[in-house]
Amino acid sequence: AFSQLNLSADLVWSGGYSPVEEPTEGPDGWWENNWTSGEAAKAGWDLWSTNEEAKAWSDKFSNVLVCGDDQIYRYEGYFQAPESSSLKNWSSFVAAEMSCQYNEGKSFTELKSNIKDFRAWLMENSTGEEFSFGAYIPTGEDSADFWWYNWHGDFEAMARGNANWEKNGKEMQAKFDDTATCT
C-alpha cells in the first residue's frame, strides 16, 4: 500500500523488518526507505510530512505501524551481490543483520576489498539460490561502524546458505574477521 502512494520517483525501495524474537528493548520493527541520495531522502520526508494522502495512509495503518521521527537513522548502502544470484522478490524475505566495528587500523577500504572477494566467492560457491548482501555505512551517529545484512528468500534458503558458508567459507570468513568484529 505504501509504494502505491507514489510520492517520489527518488524512493527506490521501502519495506518493513519484523524480528523473529521479540526485542527486549528498542523498537519492535523497522521501516527502511532506500533513496537515490541524501538530498532526495530529505525532500521526500519534507513532502511526506505535508502530504494529505500520506497522512491518510498513516492514519489508516496506525494499528499496524506507527513511525516516529525520533529514531531516523541515515546510512549509505553498499550493495555488490552478483546480479545473477541477487534476490529478485523483495516483497517477502528473511534477513540477518550484524553490527560491526572495524578492527584496529582497518577501514572501509579493507571492507570494500573483502566485499569484492566475497562477491567472487559467491559466484563460485553459492547454493544457486537467490541471495543478496549489503553493508550499511552510517552517515551520522551510530553504535556500529557498519551494519552487515544478508537477505534470503526464506528461512530454509537461509539455513542452506549458512550451512554452505560454514562448510566452504572459512577462508573468506577469516578475511572478514581480520577487517572487523561483527556481532
Stretches with model-predicted labels:
Residues 1-183:
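Short S/T/G/P-rich N-terminal loop/turn motif that feeds into the first structured element of a domain
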